[in-house]
Amino acid sequence: MAGGALGAGVVGVGVGTIFAGIARDAFQAEPAVDDGPDELLREPARAPERRQVRSADGTRLNVEVYGTDAADSDDVVVMVHGWTCNTAYWYPQINALAERTTVVAYDQRGHGRSERGRARPTVAMLGQDLDAVLDAVVGDGRRAVLVGHSMGGMTIMSWAAQYADKVPTTVSGVALTSTAAKAVLQNHTLIPMNLPRYTRPFEATVGKLFTSAPVPIPKTPYGGRLSHYIALGPNARKAHVDFVDDMIGACPHRSRAGWGAAMGKLDVTAGLEALTVPTTVIVGSDDRLTPTSHAEQMAEVLRRNGHLRDLVIYDGVGHMSSIEAAERFNELLADILAEVGSEKVPA
């Protein structure tokens, strides 16, 4: 009994020291730049066409189509958001692209307006959900450009691993943004490097608690400082920090925990190998959740296979790269569409 209590106490001290170090760095950092609202983050003026798409297990997914109908459009972009986000994550791209492009965004299961489903979340489910969406929105003989952020990039790779034969016939290009193919919880830079050495054995425990503890996130005046530290770059705009903090806070805690636990077993390298179309890898230099090492590893696999379009690193940008660097990101998407677009399936 005494030994167990002592062990628990040691763990508590180690874990507590790490969380205290994260909080210290978050609150000592420069506050976000308050330079007014970002018009790209506004809700799109034109309401989307909303569809309910059922995944393989019957879970209903909320799908939003902006712009012209996918069947009539020259370009179709399917956007897949990340962990704790929802379709609003893509507002900067929808607002910039939807007038001339069909933009499809959907809520991952358990996020936004999509059902959570009854089964325990798995990375394989993410790919199956994406397959159901693609079947519903990409017409026969058409191909789309897939854009995935964070868990959304993992979703694309999960889909490619399970449906490799569909990759060349369904997709003309891919953008993997601020994401990883494996070991995402083992390779991050959230924990300060200057903590006592005795905390090292408890870093994995902190990672699991951070991602998979099923507890609500209380709304406090200080939450934005933590969101800034965790998810955005050091010079982020306050409008971006507030937007991200509100979006994360809106994610149901059970979904956040379930998908956080699922990512603990992440390995979609088979899907990365199956991406046989031009693929762009994008990351911020200051991404703490999926550091540049992940992007470089993915880019090397794609380069070796002859399918790397480009590796793009945005200086000073954190994990929310397509919000923080929206103008540059939108220009990059426009370039990708100009090169590959939603081409017809090769004869």
Where does each model-flagged region fall?
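Flexible "cap/lid" loop of the alpha/beta hydrolase fold
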Residues: A161, D165-S212
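Short beta-strand/loop motif that positions the catalytic acidic residue
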Residues: L275, V281-V283, D287
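Alpha/beta-hydrolase fold catalytic core
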Residues: M1-V76, E99-T102, G139, P168, ...
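Catalytic histidine-centered segment of alpha/beta-hydrolase-like enzymes
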Residues: L289, L311-L332
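Acidic catalytic loop of the alpha/beta-hydrolase fold
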Residues: M263, D286-T290
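Conserved HGGG/HGGXW glycine-rich cap/lid loop of the alpha/beta-hydrolase fold
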Residues: T59-R116, V123
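Active-site loop/oxyanion-hole signature of alpha/beta-hydrolase fold enzymes
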Residues: H111-M154, Y163-V167, E331
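Conserved alpha/beta-hydrolase catalytic His-Asp/Glu region
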Residues: F210-G271
